[in-house]
Amino acid sequence: MASTVTLEDALSNVDLLEELPLPDQQPCIEPLPSSLIYQPNFNTNFEDRNAFVTGIARYIEQATVHSSMNDMLEEGQQYAVMLYTWRCCSRAIPQVKCNEQPNRVEIYEKTVEVLEPEVNKLMNFMYFQRTAIDRFCGEVRRLCHAERRKDFVSEAYLLTLGKFINMFAVLDELKNMKCSVKNDHSAYKRAAQFLRKMSEPSSIQESQNLSMFLANHNKITQSLQQQLEVINGYDELLADIVNLCVDYYENKMYLTPSERHMLLKVMGFGLYLMDGSNSNIYKLEAKKRINLTKIDKFFKQLQVVPLFGDMQIELARYIKTSAHYEENKSRWSCTSTGSSPQYNVCEQMIQIREGHMRFISELARYSNSEVVTGSGRQDAQKTDSEYRKLFDLALQGLQLLSQWSAQIMEVYSWKLVHPTDKYSNKECPDNAEEYERATRYNYTSEEKFALVEVLAMIKGLQVLMGRMESVFNHAIRHTIYSALQDFAQVTLREPLRQAIKKKKNVVQSVLQAIRKTVCDWETGREPHNDPALRGEKDPKGGFDIKVPRRAVGPSSTQLYMVRTMLESLVADKSGSKKTLRSSLEGPTILDIEKFHRESFFYTHLLNFSETLQQCCDLSQLWFREFFLELTMGRRIQFPIEMSMPWILTDHILETKEASMMEYVLYSLDLYNDSAHYALTKFKKQFLYDEIEAEVNLCFDQFVYKLADQIFAYYKVIAGSLLLDKRLRAECKNQGANISWPSSNRYETLLKQRHVQLLGRSIDLNRLITQRVSSALYKSLELAISRFESEDLTSIMELEGLLDINRMTHKLLSKYLTLDSIDAMFREANHNVSAPYGRITLHVFWELNYDFLPNYCYNGSTNRFVRTILPFSQEFQRDKPPNAQPQYLYGSKALNLAYSSIYSLYRNFVGPPHIKAICRLLGYQGIAVVMEELLKVVKSLLQGTILQYVKTLMEVMPKICRLPRHEYGSPGILEFFHHQLKDIVEYAELKSVCFQNLREVGNALLFCLLTEQSLSQEEVCDLLHAAPFQNILPRVHVKEGERLDAKMKRLEAKYTALHLVPLIERLGTPQQIAIAREGDLLTKERLCCGLSIFEVILTRVRAYLDDPIWRGPLPSNGVMHVDECVEFHRLWSAMQFVYCIPVGAHEFTVEQCFGDGLNWAGCMIITLLGQHRRFDILDFSYHLLKVQKHDGKDEIIKSVPLKKMVDRIRKFQILNDEIFAILNKYLKSGDGENMPVEHVRCFQPPIHQSLASN
């Protein structure tokens, strides 16, 4: 029975599923993550040598020697790491200032305690180099013995001796370079001597020896040379080693970059060791033992090679320091100065790209066929030739990767040895430090791009080959097995037959040993009936040997044994007078040599994943222990600006080069390489910690810069898309080109959801989203802040900025999961929980403090313009915030273009501004603003204006009749001028009183224009909503067609868009209710003819409750005719005042106050119901009528009559227009016919003569 699972366990299991990384479709632009395939190490270091009892005993003995030498090489590598990564301890230890210091004993004790383990390591290092030199010289002595000189020495053995030479060269250079090692030893020695730690003579002597060993430069080389020179014929053996290296280098018999560089170092150091007091390399060349011309050519091509970490060696230095260089100087071209083309990476890019393209195409063909056919096809179905193709492809790929990695390392090495200066590079400052001159200022832009591109090729190809690792591994094992078995069982059969037949026992024993060592017979044993084993010919039908096929590679010892025994057959030395080679036929020799060459790479290929990693390893680009040592403790670590991985990454970001943008993660991967190397090869935690600290800093910088760039890029696109096309065209005609942003490849980076860096999986998309969201919010915030620091006209610019941010958000939302722009806008506008936001508050603020008191309305243009004579004090605003272009319109050019567009809206407030206010404030904001404006109007009407009305009513004549026509217009003008003398001369009338009325008028006009704009917006909404509400336009009907049939077809066509039935069918009850309400509101909004302005007028009417506005009840019970007690009579007096023409240098009322003044007066008259009386009884209108009749023109009391009448006529037209608009809004609810209740019946008037009767 299945075990029961509790609910908690089940839920936790489901939660765990979230942690499973699911394969996604993100583009692959990052290097291969650490392989999860187990990497077995089949290299036994000859531990299994005793199993091969069938092999030749000499070579088994040689394998034993090999094994111990490999162990020594490994130990030497550990000492090299120890020296290279040594950091000075003594600098961190407090120093004893004087002998009287009380705590000096304690300091010395601590010094000894800390430094003793380190000094022990140095002591062990000194012993090791002695042992290693003795061991190496012992091997040389053994091989140079007179009786063994003719003996065959295998290439593998010579190569191991070559590795020893390389080890000595590296260790000596490291020891020379590290001053901190000597300082630490000196500090220890001082402390130990003070504490009398070293009392025994032997330990004192050893300490002295160590001091001398560390102090003497080239001590290891000197010891080695001294011991070698006493060995007779050592130069011959070294010549063999150098020749082997020349041969390997020339024929590319190496795979990893370190092997390539090792061959060159062995050539150089080998020549230096050979050219001593007892031997001369130039004499050896004369004997044709070595070819110096060839070596010179190699050293000329590649002048500098990596020695260890960031230490480099100039190969010519080995030649220059050799004993017989001076007299043979002219032979060498490599010692002359001048750069090799090898270091000009830009020139080699064409060749590298071609190689990359060719190989990638070939690899893609196989990769695709594996994907297409791999699932349905068994591996066994592949033919030998197909496996061979894959084998060749794997080898070719590794060689290419190795070649490119070596290329990068060689350029880097050259640059480290040849730092720049202020003369070569103008950007390099005088005080730049050595490492900075070697890295930061030492590469041109083209060189950086070339390095990035090669790096991307290496890492990209590593990914592709890594994906096919299992396919390659199988093909490699299968091919090696086939090649080995075919060669041993088939190819060697004929030579074996010949050897048996001709009784060549040595050759026969070697061939049989090879076959016994490696053959895997189909039947499990060698066929005993094979005629070749008896030296006989095959029968006429032939002798059939079936070679089996498996995917199993040979062991490392097996391969070594086979290759060494084969080599012994074709070698020029054999230990006897006659070589074994002479016993073999020509074709056999060629077959053996061919197999021997091919099998060289088998070891590398059998460890495919490890070799792949080594061929792509560029970890040394980060390590800088040598240069840190040169700073003598001034630097603990270099800043990121000097670090190669960041230099390359930052260069891509700074140049914004589109073709390189996708490679940016590859240069960051150098940190992965370095961290892996620090942990697995150097095994130093502190180095890893330093790399990690740099990565933390660099990645923050990377995300910061990248997100800023991406935001700016999409902002520029948004700004360009929304820029008026006519302006762009006009600018182009004028020769000022506003360019479109060049396309960049940020999309690929935006899709990266798991970037691998130092074992972390980073969601780059999420990090960029956070920064872009912040930038968008900052942009919105800035747009509103700019609006808050400017007047009402800048509402146009605010709307433009918000539109561009909206468009930027829309473009970015394709790749990033951003908050909705409306939510961001509400947050920036402080409108999340508050009922109204910053924009609404500022709009009202501007209306109240600047717009109402300082703007003049012009009914002809329908615009408000700033008054030329301000009555209120200057309004102080905050300074607009400074901002980078990407937070405004995107770029400087776009900022300029948009500024020029919005400058056209700067000098007025009109319908465009008010429409923008409507769109930005919405119903809620408009309601708030209007409510506040009504409060302003109320305070004015019930405050200052009321006081002025009361004051002016007192100076008005109690009775002022309209004079008869017979007086003529000049007389009437003089009469009114005299009657209204006090009003005309009232000082504050044309300033404070008119100013207050203008504010009321402007407030009213703003409400009216807002409603008009709102209506247009609502009509637009309605038209947009119509298709979704089943409101369809009437279709054109031709003759003979039926309207209802056509309409039904149209309805059927758009039925899928009809929203309410759709939500009623699919939505929740809450959604259905919302949909119905929305539908109803949209349909009814304009249909029911609601009017804001009418409500506002009604509200204002309630403010006019003081009796002064209407005056006392008329004595005749109908209306006041000649009495000046109602507001319209006061307004007539005011109108008479502002109709008087002004002097040449005075401002008119229109210039000072605009039409707002007239709107205020007319509104009060209309709301008081005094409109018609005003029309009939107005003083100015009466003068106009009389002047129109008599046409006189005189100057009365310095008032030109004709000019005054012209002004009266203009104001009469304006007043009529205002009354018409006001009456339209006030009577909109009254219908056409006035109700009967409003009609009053009066007795007909009776003539006075009859009245007395």
UniProtKB/Swiss-Prot annotation:
It is found in: Cytoplasm; Cytoplasm, Perinuclear region; Cell projection, Lamellipodium; Cell projection, Ruffle. Disulfide bonds: none annotated. Keywords: Actin-binding, Cell projection, Cell shape, Cytoplasm, Developmental protein, Differentiation, Neurogenesis, Synapse, Synaptosome. InterPro entries: CYRIA/CYRIB_Rac1-bd (IPR009828), Cytoplasmic_FMR1-int (IPR008081). Involved in formation of membrane ruffles and lamellipodia protrusions and in axon outgrowth. Binds to F-actin but not to RNA. Belongs to the CYFIP family. This is Cytoplasmic FMR1-interacting protein 1 homolog. The lineage of its organism: Eukaryota, Metazoa, Chordata, Craniata, Vertebrata.
